């Protein structure tokens, strides 16, 4: 996969999770602080993943992208689970 495509995928997934948090913040006004922390975590994760993708390790490129995809989907799954628990 191209870096451009991976950046778009990362932005899309993080955007969807962020949108879910916005919806949850309107539904659960009593859990606003937890939701704000989750939104900050999503933005920090997105920034970290995009920075990693912008500076690819020169040695093992295939391994780098494989690890990147694993980390991306692991973060997405973890955050989605946290949203469901609210």
Per-region residue spans from a language model:
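N-terminal acidic leader/helix
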Residues: 1-30
């Amino acid at each position: 996969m191209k870096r451009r495509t991976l950046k778009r995928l990362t932005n899309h997934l993080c955007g969807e999770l962020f949108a879910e948090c916005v919806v949850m913040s309107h539904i659960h006004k009593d859990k606003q602080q937890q939701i704000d922390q989750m939104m900050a975590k999503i933005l920090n994760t997105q920034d970290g993943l995009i920075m990693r993708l912008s500076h690819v390790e020169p040695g093992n490129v295939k391994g780098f992208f494989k690890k990147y995809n694993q980390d991306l989907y692991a973060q997405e799954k973890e955050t989605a689970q946290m949203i469901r628990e609210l």
